[in-house]
Curated annotation (Swiss-Prot):
The gene is nusG. Keywords: Transcription, Transcription antitermination, Transcription regulation, Transcription termination. The keyword Transcription regulation applies. It comes from Chlamydia muridarum (strain MoPn / Nigg). One of its GO terms (biological process) is regulation of DNA-templated transcription elongation. InterPro entries: KOW, NGN, NGN-like_dom, NGN_dom_sf, NusG-like, Rib_uL2_dom2, Transcrpt_antiterm_NusG, Translation_prot_SH3-like_sf. Participates in transcription elongation, termination and antitermination. One of its GO terms (cellular component) is cytosol. It comes from the Bacteria. Gene3D superfamilies: 2.30.30.30, NusG, N-terminal domain (3.30.70.940). This is Transcription termination/antitermination protein NusG. Pfam families: NusG.
Length: 182
């Protein structure tokens, strides 16, 4: 019976391991034991210096989902693939429950259907400015323009609130409450 397993792989080798498993599966006749291999990822829009770029980001870096019929042979084949660390569960791989699989696959489908904004700045959140004339100032986001990758921030200069417009997302970082003075 086919079940889903989580396989830990070396970080930054996820695509390479997935391709190795798929290629070897076809070449060695393991297709009867390994049905599907998924590298959970989503498309994320990043804005750097005014340029919009869609990049693929791994949802769980260092992990693959493998739908397989677990036998000694199939377990050994996956385990010996270069870049594989181990199955989740260690010595005795533990299959995901049907409910977990349903939730994971639904979540992946939702994330693949669109593009996620890398920066999720919200009006009212506190940010620190890292570039430009107001570098190191901490302020509160007053407007967000996700389509342009820009925002406006209210900062206090000599006790007076001043609006800083047209900051790009990369020019600021979110600050947790209580960290304003760092």
């Amino acid at each position: 019976m086919f079940k889903w397993y989580v396989v830990q792989v070396f970080t930054a080798q996820e695509k390479k391991v997935k391709k190795s498993l798929e290629d070897f599966k076809e070449a060695s006749g393991m297709s009867d034991f390994i049905q599907q291999i998924i590298l959970p990822s989503e498309n994320v829009m990043e804005v750097k210096k005014g340029e919009h770029k869609i990049v693929e980001k791994y949802i769980w870096p260092g992990y693959l989902l493998v739908k397989m019929h677990l036998t000694d042979e199939s377990w050994s084949y996956v385990k010996k693939t270069q870049g594989v660390v181990e199955f989740l569960g260690g010595g005795a791989p533990v299959a995901l429950s049907e409910e977990e699989v349903k939730n994971i696959l639904a979540d992946l489908e939702e994330k693949k259907s669109g593009v996620v904004q890398k920066h999720k700045f919200e009006v009212g959140s506190q940010v620190k400015i890292n570039d430009g004339v107001f570098v190191n100032f901490v302020g509160v986001v007053s407007e967000v323009f996700h389509d342009k990758g820009r925002l406006s921030v209210m900062v206090s200069i000599f006790g007076r609130e001043t609006r800083v417009d047209d900051l790009e997302f990369w020019q600021v970082e979110e600050v947790a409450p209580g960290q304003e003075s760092e």
